[in-house]
Swiss-Prot record:
The gene is IFF4. Pfam families: Hyphal_reg_CWP. One of its GO terms (biological process) is cell-substrate adhesion. It is found in: Secreted, Cell wall; Membrane. Keywords: Cell wall, Glycoprotein, GPI-anchor, Lipoprotein, Membrane, Secreted, Signal, Virulence. The lineage of its organism: Eukaryota, Fungi, Dikarya, Ascomycota, Saccharomycotina. Residues 525-541, 1193-1207 have a biased composition (Polar residues). It is a lipid-anchor; GPI-anchor. InterPro entries: Hyphal-reg_cell_wall_N (IPR021031). Residues 1503-1526 form a propeptide. This is Cell wall protein IFF4. Induction: Repressed by HAP43 and in absence of GOA1. GO terms for cellular component: cell surface; extracellular region; fungal-type cell wall; side of membrane. It comes from Candida albicans (strain SC5314 / ATCC MYA-2876).
Length: 1526
């Protein structure tokens, strides 16, 4: 029978190993998934999302590594999750994220996780709907939590949360969050963690006989939360926070006082609240500051707990201020959204070879969605990939004749021709298409005036490029006829009040149609001009406009070649148009006041895809005058535009996009004052001839412009007020929206300059005092019944909303994209969304939105700051609310782009302060709910700032303050990743680009989770470049072996970079940590180098920063001492040359050793005629490597000097003799004697002098000539080079060390990622010293015995890999079983690590130690310090995560490690410390990569705190039954 047991266990273990699942990349599975494969390991950076798998039964070990995730979710109302791990031989270990989410299910959920042990240092979420009672239990025998556990229900039911094996114990040092849940205590509670009751939650201490640690905390967060304690037990005191505002604390019996004591009492001096039932009482430490009169007795009748009448106490006042313990400060995060729970679609490319042997490329559109029953399905549509080009040519001839009636019958004629030529761009996915639109517009303007003049204007020619890019894919289709008609009429009246009057009535109407093409285009241009000419000279204005046009429609179409009349439900076109035109009006040969106003409007219509579009407006302004005149011009313009389109296919989406950027140059040299008031009302009606619903949109524009110009000798003031109002009407039943626009622009024009030339050309500089802004407010009410619609949208910036959407760009350059599906979403940066509208559903929503965004400006000087604020709020049905507050402080002439990504229940605040001439790109990305982030940015002038602030999986909020210098590119990216401590980062800067950083890391409890703050280098470019700079910044973060607080400063020097042909530049900075609070830490300095790679791309449009970091222990850098010679006399000539370089010794870069060279050349003193012997001595100070001012050239903190003797010679007859005479100088620099401070690199170094010939001055009148040449080299101590350096023994803070030579490392130190990688080395297998069999007790009932053996593979390269086999023997009723587990060391490393002295233990040498990963250094006690890498215990009670070595023979008594007994008769202790890399004691330490260390204790039956015999009997019974069944 015993053999059978061993055989079964062996087979089970082998099956578990063979069928293990390793997840190394992101994976999504939908539907039924079998998890009965054995061990499941999810590696860092990977995630596994399982969706709608009803039963998930883990039969092996579950191990989720740091930075990895496991999601099991249900999206069905009828399918609830059943997740279990019932085996008693395996464990659960989570360092990442585990989420079980069944909140949408209407049936009960069950989460039953048992196992041998449970350890959580990451985040675990258990969520259910709460409509019916659900089961949530974690009942492992060994139970430890140092991370976050969240138990969530939508509403409270009678279900309870059970933690730990009944009557056992749990250790909670993290936080346990309850939301609408009841926790019922069934075990002892150890540790100093926190239980948080959120919403309608209750903490029920059901058995006070199972003690609760006095350091455990209970936090009542909301007014409906409560805490109940069993009354029949010994009296205990519970730490309760947040009591007040109506929540409750009670007992399981009614509160009844005795003769001298009331039912409840509060001690205001101690903060203790006592509740009594006769002689039974319990105490609660609620804190100070409560008013005894506000306590009252109530009944807690919540479900899932005993409802005791008058058994609880409530406090009606607010909660007094009280600091929360650290464990309660960890945030209770919302349930994370699992990848893949929402329908998605994407495209894929398939390449195959057909029967003819040709390669065919096909494109597949893959859609993953659910049907009406909730089942997932995948649809793939395959169609050929088309590679075509689109060429569009538009030629417009504009003829303008102005008949001017004058007293002398002089006729002025103005003509112009404008050509528009378009060019293809990138790879458009249309079929080859060419369309030509020819149009001739004629305009006759009769002008009557009393002034005699004659003028003729030459042709004005402008070119614009029409650029089109599209993401639409379609096959060739034939449209027989397309009819488009568009008429435009304009009535214009002008009234000029001046010395002469003129009335101008102009009527312009044009129409044209184009057919016979898939994409016919129609162009309408309207040009009106009013002029009153009286001038002898002229100035011109060049107006350049850039217009981006975007058209997007959605389509789900049938694809057929050469199909006639194909009906499309949706179509998708992305059209981007950019045009640049320059209008110029030449000098007039007449005198007077001239005002010429030109307006043109172009409309492009794409016919076959039913889309509205779009307007391009260009304007030209010409002002010229030579006399002082006041002119008032008032113009009223009313226009009505109607457009009818005949479209064969219905259109379900419309997009209206406007984007205009204009630049105006005004040249004036006279004094004039004019006032221009223009009012324009436009009504545009578009009526597509389809059966689909139309839409109605009202858009109001209001613009006010004020301009001021001043010249040295004249004064000119122009006041223009333009008010325009236009409406775009598209009729839709029961749906309307209004979008008012309001724009205000004020500009100041600087003094002009007058030239004496006959045709003066003047130039003016524009100073923008206040930027313009745009406001859009929308209020929409939509009631509609819509059938099922699927739309795929691709756009730069657009919004999808049930009620309409509002996206506002600046008034000078703006784009609007509108689309109305049924769900509201916000996308940007070419996002793809798939809104779904259920059939025959009724949606009602109301939305009010206001968005204010500043405009684009350009300036040469800075001005005062103007504040803007904006608020965006949207509410759709029962969806979570989105809120974002942005406050911008921006002066004029700045380019500000703000992008906000919103997800449910997020909040973000950003405050920006930017001077003039700056480009600020701010992106706030909140990835997870319930997080807050505040950022303050202040930037001097002429700076480009890219700031990205995000909170990803963070447990705490962060505050950042950043200021950057002028003319610099600063990139800063800060994330707080799974940290248990708050972080504060402050960046300060001046014009020297000095960045100081202060970081405090309190609890670096998890080595795999790095909290990194990186300050990148400053970038300065004086010349414009077209390169994309990828800045790779590596910064060393110091983590000594005993880490308490870490503070360091960073100093960065801006470097000016000219355009380089190679495009590669390097910048360096140094970082110097401040003194640490730990006595075992030494001050040190690190240096970092940033490399900038140049790529052919626009600098401003695409740049990103990638920051990497490495952990390092005490890091030293080399610095070079410099020499200086004192002046001999005022007549002496001296030249001092000191050159030095610092290089990073932390291994961040693979650089050659830097050589610090300093040379001093001294010219001799001029002597007249005498025999003299001259001796010159130089004295200098050395530099300590831990100097806090390492970035400066100061040489400080080295108080030793050296003297250089100068050899002299007799009279020199010729210059040749000078070369034959040399000298050698020798110096020695000793230690500074400052305790544990790092010493200078030049220590006990006998340097050498290189004798070089030195040219001398004319010595014809001197009897002696002296030449001094002193040159020496100091080698760098970087261990990655073959540096030769010796150091002196020294003592620092009680830490003894001997002289050590720096090593030459032939391989790089393994990084954190390398540690997590398993290496398989080939080599000889040698058995190590072996493990000593440890038999703690005889094979009695409930006893365990463990024995182990180990061996090592030594590869030819010198690395080792260790194996260990552990055999665990368990006995029950004299029947024993064995469990054999084999472990393999996961790191292959070079054995170059040296140990250090550790005086924490004195004991004998343990001969059974496993071969260490480093050299065995005998300590003072004679004990071998062994860094074992064999965690062969199967039961884990983590005692510490620090580096621990196990000392002492296990047969000794009273030995312990980190407070855990190792030599007790009832436990078995193991400790391990995997250590890799290289380390040298002494001055120059290498980087040490230390893996996680653990202490293991297996408890046995020998005391009330261990596993009871009853449980072991039950365990044995279950095993016996399983054996019998097998």
């Amino acid at each position: 029978m015993k053999f059978l047991q061993k055989f079964i266990i062996t087979v089970a273990l082998l099956t578990n190993i063979v069928f293990a699942i390793d997840i190394t990349e992101n994976k999504v599975d939908r539907g039924s998934v079998t998890l009965s494969f054995g061990e499941i390991i999810i590696h860092p950076g990977a995630s596994w999302s399982i969706i709608d798998n009803a039963f998930s039964n883990f039969i092996g070990k579950l191990d989720v590594k740091a930075k990895s995730a496991l999601y099991i979710s249900s999206t069905s109302h009828l399918l609830a999750l059943q997740v279990s791990l019932t085996t008693l031989l395996h464990s659960i270990n989570n360092s990442g994220i585990i989420s079980f989410d069944s909140r949408v299910s209407l049936t009960p959920s069950s989460y039953d996780l048992r196992g041998l042990s449970f350890t959580n240092s990451g985040e675990m979420y258990f969520a259910a709907s709460g409509r019916v009672p659900s089961t949530m239990s974690l009942t492992s025998a060994s139970w430890t939590n140092t991370g976050l556990l969240s138990f969530y229900q939508n509403q409270r039911t009678s279900g309870a949360v059970c933690l730990g094996f009944p009557l056992g114990s749990i250790t909670n040092s993290g936080k346990i969050c309850l939301n609408n849940q009841v926790y019922q205590q069934t075990t002892q509670i150890k540790g100093s963690g926190c239980f948080s009751a959120n919403g309608d939650s209750t903490i029920y201490i059901a058995n006070v006989l199972l003690s609760v640690s006095a350091n455990q905390n209970f936090h009542l967060v909301d007014k409906d939360s409560s805490m109940i304690v069993q009354a029949i037990s010994t009296t205990q005191t519970f730490n309760v926070y947040g009591f007040g505002n109506g929540n409750k604390i009670g007992l399981t019996l009614p509160l009844i006082g005795i003769i001298l004591e009331s039912a409840h009492s509060y001690d205001s001096s101690t903060g203790i609240l006592t509740l009594r039932n006769f002689l039974l009482e319990q105490r609660f430490n609620i804190g100070l500051g409560y008013d005894s009169s506000k306590f009252s007795v109530v009944t807690d009748s919540g479900s899932g707990i005993p409802s005791t009448i008058w058994g609880s106490v409530t406090y009606t006042g607010r909660v007094p201020t009280r600091a929360l313990p650290k464990s309660c400060q960890m945030a209770c995060k919302p349930i994370p959204e699992a990848p893949g729970v929402k329908p998605t679609d994407y495209t894929t490319t398939i390449t195959k070879t057909n029967t003819a042997g040709n390669t065919v490329t096909e494109t597949g559109a893959v859609t993953i969605s659910t049907d009406k029953s909730g089942s997932w399905f995948t649809t793939t549509s395959i169609f050929p990939t088309l590679t075509t080009a689109t060429s569009t040519s538009i030629t417009t001839t504009l003829s303008n004749e102005a008949h001017i009636k004058t007293t002398d019958n002089t006729l002025a004629k103005v003509s112009s021709t404008v050509d528009y030529i378009s060019a293809p761009i990138s790879s458009s996915e249309f079929i080859s298409l060419e369309s030509f639109v020819d149009e001739t517009l004629s305009n006759e303007n009769p002008i009557s005036t009393s002034t005699d003049y004659a003028s003729e204007n030459s042709f004005a020619i402008s070119e614009s490029t029409f650029i089109t890019a599209s993401d639409f894919q379609a096959t060739e289709s034939l449209v027989t006829e397309s009819y488009f008609s568009k008429s435009q009429s304009s009535d214009s009246e002008s009234f000029v009040i001046n010395t002469s009057s003129a009335v101008d009535n102009s009527y312009v109407s044009s129409s044209s149609s184009a057919g016979g093409s898939s994409f016919p285009e129609e162009t309408h241009m309207l040009q009106t001009s009013d002029s009153d000419l009286s001038s002898t000279a002229g100035s011109e204005s060049d107006v350049t406009e850039f217009s981006d046009v975007s058209l997007a429609t959605a389509s789900d179409s049938s694809i057929a070649d050469k199909s006639i009349g194909t009906e499309s439900l949706y179509s998708e076109i992305s059209l981007v148009s950019a045009s640049e035109s320059t209008g110029s009006i030449g000098e007039l040969s007449i005198s007077g006041d001239t005002l010429l106003k030109t307006a043109s409007e172009t409309k492009f219509v794409k016919s076959s895809f039913s889309s509205d579009l779009i307007s391009e407006t260009s304007s030209e302004l010409f002002v010229s005058s030579s006399v002082s005149t006041d002119m008032i011009l008032e113009t009223a313009n009313d226009s009505f535009i109607t457009s009818d389109k005949v479209v064969e296919t219905p259109s379900y989406s419309n997009e209206l996009a406007f984007e205009t950027v204009s630049e105006t140059i005004i040249n004036s040299f006279v004094s004039s004052e004019s006032s221009l008031n223009t009012a324009s009302n436009s009504l545009i009606a578009s009526k597509p001839s389809t059966d689909s619903s139309s839409y109605t949109t009202d858009i109001d524009f209001e613009t006010t412009t004020k301009s001021f110009a001043e010249s040295p000798s004249y004064f000119s003031e122009t006041v223009s007020e333009i008010a325009s109002k236009s409406s775009l009407s598209m009729v839709e039943p029961s749906c309307w929206s209004e979008l008012p626009f309001e724009t205000s622009i004020e500009s100041l024009i600087a003094p002009s300059y007058i030239s004496s030339e006959p045709a003066p050309e003047t130039a003016s500089e524009s100073f923008i005092v206040k930027p313009s802004y745009s406001e859009i407010a929308s209020e929409s009410i939509t009631k509609s019944i819509i059938s099922t619609i699927e739309a795929s949208i691709s756009s730069d910036i657009f919004s999808d909303a049930t009620t309409g959407s509002i996206v506002v760009q600046p008034s000078v350059s703006s784009g609007i994209s509108l689309e109305i599906p049924s769900e509201s979403m916000l996308f940007s940066e070419s996002s793809i969304s798939k809104p779904f509208i259920s059939s025959q559903s009724i949606h009602e929503c109301t939305s009010d939105s206001i968005l204010v965004v500043p405009s684009f400006f350009s300036s040469d000087v800075s001005f005062e700051t103007v504040e803007y604020s904006s608020t965006v709020s949207t509410s759709v049905d029962a969806e979570p609310s989105y809120s974002s507050e942005i406050s911008l402080k921006t002066p004029s002439e700045s380019f500000i782009v703000s992008e906000t990504f919103l997800e449910p229940s997020y909040s973000g605040e950003v405050v920006l302060a930017t001077p003039s001439e700056s480009v600020v790109a701010s992106e706030t990305d909140v990835n997870k709910p319930s997080y807050s982030n505040e950022a303050v940015l202040q930037t001097p002038s002429e700076s480009y700032i890219l700031s990205e602030t995000g909170v990803k999986e963070s447990s705490e909020s962060s505050e950042f303050a950043l200021s950057t210098p002028s003319t610099s590119f600063i990139a800063s990216e800060t994330f707080t990743v799974q940290s248990f401590a708050s972080s504060e980062v402050s960046f300060g800067s001046d014009r020297e680009s000095t960045i100081s950083t202060e970081a405090i890391q309190v609890e670096p409890s998890i080595s795999n989770d790095v909290v990194l703050e990186t300050a990148s280098e400053s970038f300065i470019s004086k010349a414009p470049t077209t390169s994309e700079f990828t800045i790779l910044s590596e910064t060393s973060i110091v983590e000594p072996s005993i880490l308490s607080d870490l503070r360091f400063e960073t100093t960065s020097q801006s470097t000016e970079m000219a355009p380089s042909a190679t495009g590669v530049s390097y910048f360096s900075s140094t970082e110097t940590p401040l003194a640490s609070s730990s006595s075992y830490e030494s001050s040190f300095a690190t240096s970092s180098v940033s490399a900038i790679q140049s790529i052919n791309s626009q600098v401003a449009s695409a740049s990103f920063v990638s920051a990497d970091s490495t952990d390092s222990s005490e890091v030293g850098s080399s610095y070079t001492t410099a020499s200086a010679f004192g002046p001999a006399s005022s007549a002496s000539e001296e030249k001092f040359i000191s050159v030095w370089e610092t290089s990073n010794s932390g291994g961040s870069f693979t650089l050659e050793s830097s050589t610090s060279v300093a040379s001093v050349v001294t010219t001799p003193l001029p002597f007249t005629s005498n025999d003299i012997i001259t001796e010159i001595s130089s004295t200098w100070n050395g530099a300590k490597s831990d100097s806090p001012h390492t970035s400066e050239s100061d040489i400080t903190s080295q108080y030793n000097s050296h003297s250089t003797s100068v050899a002299t010679r007799s009279d020199s007859i010729s210059l040749t003799d000078t070369f034959e005479i040399g000298f050698a100088s020798t110096w020695t620099t000793g230690g500074s004697g400052n305790g544990g401070s790092m010493k200078s690199d030049v220590s006990n170094q006998d340097s050498y002098a290189t004798m070089l010939p030195t040219s001398f001055l004319d010595t014809s009148n001197s009897d002696i000539t002296t030449g001094v040449v002193s040159t020496w080299d100091a080698k760098n101590s970087n261990s990655y080079t073959s540096a030769e350096l010796s150091t002196d023994p020294y003592s620092s803070d009680g830490y003894a060390s001997s002289a050590t030579a720096a090593l030459s490392i032939t391989e790089s130190i393994p990084t954190t990622d390398t540690i997590n990688t398993e290496y398989h080395s080939n080599g000889d297998i040698t058995t190590s010293g072996g493990f000593k069999e440890i038999s703690l007790t005889s094979h009695y009932e409930g006893g365990f015995t463990s024995e182990s053996a180990g061996y090592t593979i030594a590869s030819p390269s010198g690395s080792t890999q260790e194996f260990a086999t552990a055999t665990i023997t368990s006995c029950f009723e004299s029947k024993c079983s064995e469990n054999v587990v084999t472990y393999i060391s996961s790191v292959s490393h070079s054995t170059v690590t040296t140990g250090y002295e550790d005086t924490r233990f004195t004991g004998s040498i343990f001969s059974g130690d496993l071969a260490s990963t480093g050299d065995n250094i005998v300590s003072a006690s004679g004990r071998s310090v062994t860094d074992a890498t064999n965690p062969f215990a199967t039961n884990t009670d983590i005692g510490t995560t620090s580096t621990v070595s196990l000392y002492g023979d296990l047969n000794d008594s009273d030995s312990s490690v980190s407070g855990y007994p190792t030599n007790r008769s009832d436990s078995n202790g193991y400790a391990n410390t995997p250590t890799t890399g290289s380390n040298t004691s002494g001055d120059f330490s290498q980087t040490i990569e230390t893996g996680s260390s653990s202490f293991t204790a297996i408890p046995f039956e020998n005391g009330s705190t261990n596993i009871s015999n009853k449980y072991l009997k039950f365990l044995g019974t279950v095993v016996s039954i399983l054996i019998l069944l097998i």
